[in-house]
Structure formats: structure tokens, C-alpha cells
Amino acid sequence: MGFGGAFIHSRTGLVTEYMSEEWLDDVKFAAEKLHENGLEAYLYDEDRWPSGTCGGYVTQEKCFRAKYMTYKEITEEYEKPENFIGLFAVIFNGLSVKEYRKISSPADKKQDERVFVFYYDYMQPDSFYNGYTYADTMNLQATERFIELTHEKYYKAFGNLFGAVIKGIFTDEPHRNPYLNGFGKKGKNPKK
């Protein structure tokens, strides 16, 4: 059993700027050397993992960042969140929602109701994403931007190598929230 090729993949600790001219030259050199030695070359389309951010370049634009819906209970007048979805009056039966209705103001709640404001928020920046966040993979424009900054940039730099020298591009785990973004931590879920 032997090795038939390699994936050219950036990893934690990369010194060369990801997708820079130097990076592209290095990738081209590695692919050509693999080919000269009878090995297949494949590219990985991300700086570390998961695929979708182009090393944070995609999510420099806030509209392309991963977002999630969240809520908080309010007991009095409140400042409407920037990404407001709705205000709801809720009656619970233990931990289960018995009834709910959309309301306009906390003053609209009845005696046995609790009031919750729902809104969406963006994933917090993280050093793993070079100071940015994961991408909103449900946003077509974010995905198109990722392809433009990664796949198309590789093709523009050395498209003549695709097929014969570079056999393909590997993409990895295009979704991993909520498991690695605080899901289930104290303060993130309702107490009741």
C-alpha cells in the first residue's frame, strides 16, 4: 500500500498569508512537484477548517457572518434589539410552552404570561477565524463570495493545472454551528 497523492492544506501556524501571491506560488510549486513524482495533487479550499470563510476574508463583511436566532425574557420596557424578530407573550406548563402570541409591547401581557423578545445575533469574532467568524452558509452571496475568493482565485492563478496536475478541490464541513459557538452553555438557554 502506498500513497497516491496529497492534499495541499493550510494548517494552524501558517506563516505565509493565506491566498496571497506567495501562497499561490507555493501551492502551484507543490502541485507541480507532486505531478513530477507521479503523485496526484488535490487542494483544500480553506485556511484550516471548516470551509466557507477563505481564512476570514469572506466574513470581513458583517452581512456574510454566521448568525443565529436568540431570545431573552423581559419584565419591563426594553430597548428594541437591532435585529428584532418579534415580541411574544408565553404561558408555560412546567418547561413546555402551553400558549404563545405575538404582542406589540410588554404592557400587552396578561397576568399569567411571560414576555420574550426574539432577535438574531451574529457569531462573535474568534481567533480561529483570523479575528472574524464562520460564514452564513445559507446566504447565497456569502457562498458566492467564498467561491470567488478561493476556487476562482486558484483557477485564475493556475487554471491550466486543473485536470491533469490538480485533480480536484476538497471542501469540508460546511456547517458546524451551534455545537462550537456556545450552544448549551449557561446563560444561552432558557432557565424555565
Region locations from a protein language model:
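Mature extracytoplasmic enzyme cores
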Residues: 1, 19-192
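N-terminal cofactor/phosphate-binding cores enriched in small/glycine residues
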Residues: 1-11, 15
